[in-house]
Amino acid sequence: MKDLIKAREEIDLIDTEIIRLFEKRMDIVKDVVIYKIANKLPVLDSSRENAMLEKNINKIKNEEYKKYYEKVLKGFLEASKDMQKELLK
């Protein structure tokens, strides 16, 4: 049981770091929106999104984890696009 508690505590620490990085990412997304507005660019840039997905998924060393990381990354992208759309209203 102690190992389970320790593992969960480690996960909690990692989650805290993920939250910090997510907030930082979303702050930068706001900067991207400002740029897109100033330059009359669309929210969706499929070529950038696809290249970023491929590049980052390929950074995962454990092949077993790649499909799961892809889901996480796509979730981040959707959240970013949703926020951009909200800010463009």
Residues covered by each model-derived region:
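Domain-level signature for soluble enzymes in the chorismate/prephenate branch of the shikimate pathway
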Residues: 1-89
